[in-house]
């Protein structure tokens, strides 16, 4: 791997981007995206108590490191009990960090804390810095799923449509909405929306894509 990094590290490069396989489907890659945590020895600092990211102290120049893949194999025996408190700490330290607001709202949804999920994800959408359409659509999908879990299907439908309109180039909004309609016996609607999902043929290399 060192040779691949050195080949990409031309003059002026301070940060490297590489293929990161976050999950696996048997021997195949599941969720994958470009990660960027290879950086120069100086000029960067790490922030956040969880979902750590690196931020440059000044100008930076990144390069794609071709042929380098990092595989993520989480330890299933390791407790995740501290994860939610650390996310809450991250948001309390920097309430205007849109990424952490999304992560916290998503975690509330995963924990079945649906009212808190709706509140925090709505706050994420209202932040001026929350401009990444894929992530905004993901927040809308989790809001929709929370409303559905609370038995409010009309509100869930509204948010699924909003998610699709926010990021029509992502499969996930249309797929999730189709799955809900199928479960409710609305087969015509499910077919319509699953075809919307199938019409998206290019997968984005972001962590949102599943």
Regions found by a protein language model. Name each.
Residues 1-119:
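Catalytic-site signature of metal-activated, phosphate-bearing donor transferases
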Residues 79, 97, 136, 170, ...:
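Residues that mark the junctions of alpha-helical repeat units in TPR/alpha-solenoid scaffolds
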Residues 81-84, 88-91, 118, 125, ...:
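Tetratricopeptide repeat
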